[in-house]
Structures are given as C-alpha cells and as structure tokens.
Amino acid sequence: MNTDFDLLLAGAGHSHLGVLNQWADGERPMGRIGLVSAEPHAWYSGMMPGLVAEHYQPRQCRIGLPRLCAAAEVEFIQGTLVALLPDTPELLLATGETLRSTWLSLNLGSLPWLPEQSGDGMELLSVKPFADFIRRWQQWQESPEPVAILGGGPAGAELALAMAGRVPAIHLFCAGELLADHPRRLRALALGHLQRADVQIHEHVSIQSVHGNTLIGDDGQIHWRGRRLVVATGPNPLDWLRDSGLRLDGDGFIEVSPALQSRSHRHVFASGDCASLPGAARNGVHAVRQAAVLATNLSRAAIGQPLRHYHPQTHSLALLADGQRGALMSWANLAAEGKLLGLWKDHLDRRFMRQHGNRD
C-alpha cells in the first residue's frame, strides 16, 4: 500500500464520524485521505447503557466504518496506533507500518483510569474500548456474579442502573460525591433511582488498588470482595501521547487552540476527549459539536484560508438512561426525569445512528 496521504484521520471518535458524514454529503477536501481505526466499527457511547440493559441489539449501536468511509471517499485503514511523529507527521502502527501525511487530525478518545492490580483474583473490565467491553460483558452474562463499579460520573451511574437486575448485586464506588459536577437535583434523582434498583452506593471511597479479590481504598482498608470489577472512571490520555512531541496539558491531553489546532504543530488538529480546550468538558456533546468546525478547518487549512473557532457552550444538556427506558435530564441548574425524556433520548440516539450509519 502507498503510505503517503494528504490528510490522515487518526481514530473514529464522534468528531471524525461527523466529519466523514459531512464529506459524504459533498464537502470533502481535495487529495488523498485515510482514516485509521483499530476496529471496523465505531460504537456510539450514548447507547451503551441501553445495550447493557438489552434495550438495543449490538448492530443498532455501531457504525460500519468501511461503509461510511467509502461514502466520504476516504480510505479505511484498520490498524492500532502505537506512536506519532508530529514533525513529519507520521503514524506508526502496531504492525510496524508507517503512514505519512501532510495534515493530521487526531480524535483518539481516552481510556478510564485503572487501579493497580496484584494477583488474578478479580477480573477488571474497562468501559473502553467499547468493542472489548461489550464482548466481555456478554461473556459475564453467561454466569452472572456480583459486580463492583468504579466511577461516580454519568457513565458509572448509567451502567449501574443498566446492570441492575442482571447481576446478583452491584456496588458503585465514587471517589467523591455521585455526579459531583452536575446539578444537585440531578444527583438526588439519580440516588433515588439507584437506591430503588438496590445498588449499594459508596461515596467518598477512593479505590486505589486491587489485591486478589479485594478492593483497597486510599485509607488502606478493604472495601469490597468479589471477582468482577467494571471501571468507568474519568478520562485518562493514551500513554504514547507523552512521547509524541505534541504540546500537552498537565494531565497529558493535547493542547489545542479554539480552531482545534495543536498549540505546537500547526499541521496537526485534535478534537474530542484527547484534546484540551478550556471550557470544553470531555463528553460526547462537545465531540459531536466540534465536528462541523473541524470539517471546515481541515478544508481551509489545506488551501491557506482562515480557520473557524469552536466556542463551547456554557451549559451542555445531559441525558442519562435510567435502565427502565426512561431518562434523567439536566441543563444548567435544572433537572427532570421521566419516560418522555427516555423517548426523547432514544429519538436523539437513533437519529445520530441514522445520520452516520445508514449510507447506501
């Protein structure tokens, strides 16, 4: 394969899906473009709790990348990225193959923070990558056992509600308060749903390690014994970014300008969870919204035109699945719950999939 490109898209996150969708509608830049992804499908994170709750089938929650790429006249390259040389720029794949490009866009996502583990008495299941999570969750369901979940954010709360009734017991561990970054009303609603679902909630318990079949907190105490742990902690950058030469923030994410352009390498763009932009929290809402700006800027940069800026909204709508086909909603300091919100969330999720996954 000729490994030289005019533009490479690394990763198939929500921003790049939106870019491909726009290009499929006829706004594609000139030149040879490729997309690199470790998997042939992109999973839509908003539908993962519904998939766990068996409200959806796997095929309803994933987007076939070869088909979407073909519609956008983009070459699909299946491979795992292990290194980046931004000065060239070049991408190194796990196979040893090197891809070169004039322009590079990174939408790599993030991974949950994992506690240190000693011994093999407990299986750890990270919520990302989604393909691995779904495959192993389905294996666990063949012989259900009690489960602990690490993570007091939306992902942890939604998964606990989705898993309720499908395993004998669930323990949800939060380093601080549940949904600490969300309105108090939403937190109260979520606590009520979790308690009614018999989820045992452990707030202000910071789990630091796994020893055998036990969870150990930062106080040195044992907080749970069991064999299965789901990790839905906050976003952690990919390890190899530290050695990439890109300018990173203090947490290891790629610093970008409001144009989603690397602060250190003007021919590199980044969006979604892997990028660090003041005011843009790491959630799917911003990743989806960044797609339009990114698509425009990738076209403009190649021909030397001024770039657009992405302006994060002060407040983002949050819709959390309640495991019973309803949803919890928050906007600014407002919060609500109900079946109608669940229908609305389902409509939005299915619309996203139609826009990105049903190309002839």
Question: Which sequence ranges carry the predicted segments?
Answer:
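C-terminal auxiliary extensions adjacent to catalytic cores
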Residues: Q324-D360
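Internal hydrophobic alpha-helix adjacent to the cofactor/substrate pocket in enzyme cavities
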Residues: H286-Q313, L319
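FAD-site-proximal beta/loop scaffold in flavoenzymes
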Residues: M122-P144, W224-R227, A232-A292, T296
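Short glycine-rich anion-binding loops that position phosphate/pyrophosphate groups of nucleotides
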Residues: S15, G109-P112, P235-P237, R325
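FAD-binding core/adjacent interface of flavoenzyme oxidoreductases
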Residues: N2-D4, L8-A10, A71-P146, D219, ...
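Rossmann-like NAD(P)H-binding beta-loop-alpha module
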Residues: R136-F173
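A Rossmann-like FAD-binding core segment of flavoenzymes
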Residues: F76-L84, L91, L99, V167-P258
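Beta1-alpha1 glycine-rich phosphate/pyrophosphate-binding loop at the start
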Residues: N2-V74, E158-R184
